[in-house]
Amino acid sequence: IVDNAKILDVPIVVFESSIYDIVAEDEKSPCYLCARMRRGHLYAKAKELGCNKIALGHHFDDVIETIVMGMLYGAQIQTMMPKLHSTNFEGMELIRPLYLVREEDIIHWAKYNELNFIRCACRLTDNCSISETGDKGSMRAEVKKLIRELAAKNPYIEKNIFRSVENVSLDTVIAYKKNGVKHSFLESYD
């Protein structure tokens, strides 16, 4: 990461945290906890440095995988937002500048610029790491593979998944949550 930043002439601050020690004790969902804690540490460090935003590298493929994962594994319809205000760090905002960029375009750009990116090096992911073919154990890898298989039959699959959360008709939804409050279609049913 430091080498990539130097190549691109981008200033970078690297700092230590104790996230791994805490996450290692969570056998059920260490990746989720790690992601939440990393984000919290990024917010705190950014605020300490006088910044008002953190930028995450989620891209288009991450977004559609998250939509499908939410439906299949979380029984919910939701997405990653391209930007949002932090609920725990007042005055801070999260942005995802690569939101509309395809993963393969990022990979090609990185190779063209001779940049190297690390995959998660956490030993807790040994049994669920994402391979290039998406064959190994993680939910995200499974969903990535499913989307790839569906896209082989229908070239609009990725765009349709992405647009599905832009075209939600609340009149045809059994229930939805707004600001943490669940609403049922029965509330307005005559």
Question: What is each PLM-predicted segment?
Answer:
Residues 33, 55, 97, 101, ...:
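A short glycine-/small-residue-rich loop at the edge of a beta-strand within enzyme catalytic domains
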Residues 36-49, 83-89, 143-164:
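Short, basic, helix/turn surface patches
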Residues 17-19, 99, 122, 166:
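Residues that form or immediately flank small-molecule/cofactor binding pockets and catalytic motifs
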Residues 115-190:
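The feature marks non-catalytic terminal segments
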Residues 23-28, 64, 68, 76-77, ...:
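Charge-rich, low-complexity amphipathic helices
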Residues 61-142, 146-147:
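Catalytic subdomain that performs nucleotidyl-dependent activation
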Residues 1-77, 81, 104-112:
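ATP-dependent adenylation/nucleotidyltransferase module used to activate substrates
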